[in-house]
Amino acid sequence: MDIIEILEHLPHRYPFLLVDRVLEIEPGKSIHAYKNVTINEPFFVGHFPHHPVMPGVLIMEALAQAAGILSFKSMDEKPSPDTVFYFAGIDEARFKKPVMPGDQLHLHIEIERQMRGVWKYKAEARVDGQLAASAKLMCAKRDL
């Protein structure tokens, strides 16, 4: 899935769109996407000027965005002005390796369960095959 299709499945835009490409998706099961991390990211201006590291909360947000794509594809839907997916929870978040400019952050998401508009996922972010972060994520679909 290229950036054009990603933009059709996520409401996020620059500077907050954190998924560049989807490599593999199995609706109802899993997604493998990535984010190219460059020194041009606006958050590197202050985090940290002499030792740039991607903030952990943005790694979690990138994982949540990939989970959102998976959810929309699993429902065979696209975002609408009447519906929103809220990032509803994070459990067991762990940060194992700093993510730096030049890294390609691979986002791996598996659906653990979905019930009544609430989705739970197992999420991992990897750089060069090494675990950078992991968490259990929860999102909730709500009508506006």
UniProtKB/Swiss-Prot annotation:
Chief place where the protein resides: cytoplasm
Pfam families in the record: FabA (PF07977)
EC numbers on record: 4.2.1.59
Record-linked CDD domains: FabZ (cd01288)
Record-annotated disulphide pairs: none
Catalytic activity: a (3R)-hydroxyacyl-[ACP] = a (2E)-enoyl-[ACP] + H2O
Function, in words: Involved in unsaturated fatty acids biosynthesis. Catalyzes the dehydration of short chain beta-hydroxyacyl-ACPs and long chain saturated and unsaturated beta-hydroxyacyl-ACPs.
Protein name listed in UniProt: 3-hydroxyacyl-[acyl-carrier-protein] dehydratase FabZ
Natural source organism: Dechloromonas aromatica (strain RCB)
